[in-house]
Amino acid sequence: MYYELSHQKQKLFTMKKLFFLFICLILIQCQKSNPEKTSTRWSEEKIWNWYNNHPWLVGTNFITSSSINQLEFWQEETFDPELIEKELKLSASIGMNTHRVFLHDLLWEQDSIGFLDRIDKFLEISDRNGIKTLLVFFDDVWHPVPNMGKQPEPIPHVHNSGWVQSPGAKILYDSLSHNKLESYIKGVVTKFADDSRILAWDLYNEAGAEGIASHDISKERAIELYEKIGIEITDDNYSSYNLNDIDPKSIKKTYTLSLLKKTVEWVRESNPSQPITTGIYAWDIDWAPLSDLSELDQFIINSSDIISFHSYGSKKDVLERLKQLKNYNRPLLCTEYIARENKSTFEDVLPIFKENKIGAYNWGLVSGKTNTIYPWKSWDSTYTAPPNKWHHDIFYQNGEPFSNDEIELIKNLTSQANK
């Protein structure tokens, strides 16, 4: 009897999933056959009107302290509404009103209905705490071989040892596989296209990223690090951990640009009421004039309704970046900052963002399994205890701040801006 009921339940779930995917395909076909419903890049007037109707936007790149990566955050078995509520309340208590949150294509592939339900639940909790959400679809940073199921334990004292790319290298480096992602993008955007709880859509984090710390370690260092979480690397299996070979930076931008172009089309065809963006981030180039940028960066700027960027540099660097980006005459969001040892601090940077009404999303809220209190160099330098200056993050898990002075500064700036 138990087997029969279980079998019937599984059959019903499969039928529901197939029905939902069928509806998505109908919507996709309707959009393709009705080109007048396809949106285009927002005009400068439209995006400025939209932006000026919002308060100063301040928040974090949010993930619960119990999650090592996007998959652990969103999977049904580890999705934790109570902890989300607790940690979002903490951010709201210091005046934060928005968060940037990463999705993953594998979550859609495994259980699209459940994934959408969990996104909806997250948005419900966020809205209850006065927080709007910037959702991120794809990410070119950290581990290129994501897998569903139980996620690895953090490598002790190592920055972001479990974060995963989306899509993984298997799909990214096979252009013919890119179209498999269309239902993911259109399914999510169509579901929430008119949802005021979503601030905007961030299509691709650090598109074409190179120089990732996890990729540049030696074989000996890889053996040492992975041994700490019970993974033995040998000559026979090293190819599975040689990330530079799996994720070759020499050709990555070509494949990323191909996927990003398709993603922009898919989102525009879904005609969301929210604007879209993809961030510019390369630290070793100027970001203007446009003609000097790579083909990928030119496309990023030209396809974004609102310009977003990452800045982990000093006050001087931020001011120079703002000068360059103001050439594009669109509102600005800094979607990643804070690297205290790198002179990217709340004290130096956040007042600049407030003065210029630039949206500000620091990396990390509550210190946890991502280990982002440790710097990037922890991949190649041994730490045995937390650094005196945290790299990212604001709070301990008990709700105590890393720095009382930082908390007072954030509170003062957000309260002044939103009077």
Question: Which role fits each region the language model picked out?
Answer:
Residues 1-15:
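N-terminal secretory signal peptides that target proteins for export/translocation
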Residues 331-333:
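Catalytic His-Asp charge-relay segment
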Residues 28-29:
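C-terminal motif of bacterial Sec signal peptides marking the signal peptidase cleavage site
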